[in-house]
Amino acid sequence: MDISILWVAIILVISSYFIFMNKWRAAKLPENLPPSPPKLPVIGHLHLLRGGLPQHVLRGITQKYGAVAHLQLGEVYSVVLSSAESTKQAMKVLDPTFADRFDSFGSQIMWYNNNDMIFSRYNDHWRQIRKICVSELLSPKNVRSFGFIRQDEMARLIRVFESSVGVPINASEEISKMSCAIVCRAAFGSVLKDQGLLADLVKEALGMASGFELADLYPSSWLLNLLCFNKYRLRRMRQRLDDILDGFLEEHRVKKSGEFGGEDIIDVLYRMQKDSENKVPITNSGIKGFIFDVFSAGTETSATTIQWALSELMKNPEKLAKAQAEVREKLKGKTNPDVAEVQEIKYPHSVVKETLRLHPPFPLIPRLCKEECEVTGYTIPAKTRILVNVWSIGRDPAYWKDPDTFNPDRFDEVSRDVIGNDFELIPFGAGRRICPGLHFGLANVEVPLAQLLYHFEWKLPQGMTPADMDMSETPGLSGPRKNPLIMVPTIHNPTS
C-alpha cells in the first residue's frame, strides 16, 4: 500500500473515532449547559485559543457569550467562570463541589503525580499536608519571626543595586534571587545550593502545567500521548529536579540545625513520616512535591508581583513619585521597617493591590467539578474542568472603572481586599483552596517594594521612555513578564 494512502487511512480512522466519541459524550450532556460558541468536529473550540494567551482569549469569549461559558477543548469539556457572581457561587456556596484540581501532564510529572499540595486532589492527603504547612510554616507567629530574614536579604539586594548605580541592571533577576533566598531560609533553614537551577525549573514547569497541551486535551489518545514531545522534555526536567532535591534532602539529613537552631518544615515532614497514626503516609515523593510547591507558589509569585509593581510604576512616573514620597515620609529614619509599619502606608499598599488586580500570579485558577450542580442557573456536569479567569474578573468594567488603567488611587473609593472575601479581586483564590501563604507572600512583596522605593531613584535605560516598555506576559500557569525588567538605580539623597 502506498504510504500516503496509509496515512490518509490512519487520519480518517482517528478522526472518525473522535467524531463518534464526541457525539456519544454530547448525547449524555444536560440540556441547560452554559452558552457556547460554534464548534468544529474533532477539535471543538480548540481553534479559538490560537493567537493569544488563554486568559486573554477566554475573556473575549465570555464577553461575547456570557460570564459563564461552556467550551469543548479537544475531547475535554470545560466551563469558564469570568464574573464575581459565578466565582462566588463556585468557590463559596458550592466550595466542596469545586475544590478538586484536574490533572495535566506537567503537574503529574513535575509535581510527583500531584503528590503535593497545589495540584493535589481534594482529599485526606491535601488536608494533611496543608495542615502541616499552615501550623509549622505559615502561622502568624512564624510569619512575624521571618522578619529578620527579609531584612538580611533586603540589605543584600540594596548592596547589589548600590554597586550598580548609574548602570542598567536586570532587576528581575536580582529580585528573584532575593525572593528565593527569603523563602528557602524561612522554609528550609538555609539557602539551597542549586536554588537558581530550581527556580529555572519552576518557571519552565509552570509554563507547561496549564493543561492546554494536546495530550491533556485528548487524554484517550495513545497516539497524541506518544507524540507529546513536551512530555519527554518534562521527564528530563524531572530528572534534573530529582538530582537537585535528592542532594538537598541528603544534606538536610546530616546537618545539625537550621536557621533557627531547631526544626524546619522538612524536619517536621521527616518526623511525621515515621508517625504510624497519619491518615495518609508521607512519602519521599510527597516531601519533594512539597518543596517544589514552596518554590512554585512562594518564590515565583512574590518575585513576579514585585516586578510587575515596579513595571507599572515605571510606566506611570506620577504614580512612582507619589509612592516614593509617601514611603519616604512614613519611613523616615527607619532602616529596617517591619511588616506592620509598611502595611500602614496607604498608597504603596494600594499599589500592590492594583498590581495584583492587573497581574494576578495565576491568571487562570484550575478546578474540577466533582458532581453535577448548578451555577448562576446553568447546569455544570460532573468531571467538568473549571477555569476561573481571575485576570478577566480583575479587568471587568462592571466592577472596575477604567479597568485596564493602572490606578492605585481607585482603592480610596473601593474598599476591596485580596484575601478571598471580595470576589472581584481574588489573586490568591478563595474558599478552602485559597493560597495558605498569602500573608507570607504579601509581606515578601510589600516590605521589599517599600525599601526599593525608599532607597533609590529609578530610571529606564538611556533613550527608553515609559511608552517603550514591553508589558507582555509569559504563557503558562503563572503570568510573569515575558522579558526581564531592566532599570537604572540611583541612590536617593534625602537632603537633595
Curated annotation (Swiss-Prot):
The keyword Heme applies. Its EC number is 1.14.14.-, 1.14.14.51, 1.14.14.53. Its cofactor is heme. Belongs to the cytochrome P450 family. This is Cytochrome P450 71D181. It comes from Thymus vulgaris (Thyme). The lineage of its organism: Eukaryota, Viridiplantae, Streptophyta, Embryophyta, Tracheophyta. It is an enzyme of class 1 (oxidoreductase). It is found in: Membrane. One of its GO terms (cellular component) is membrane.
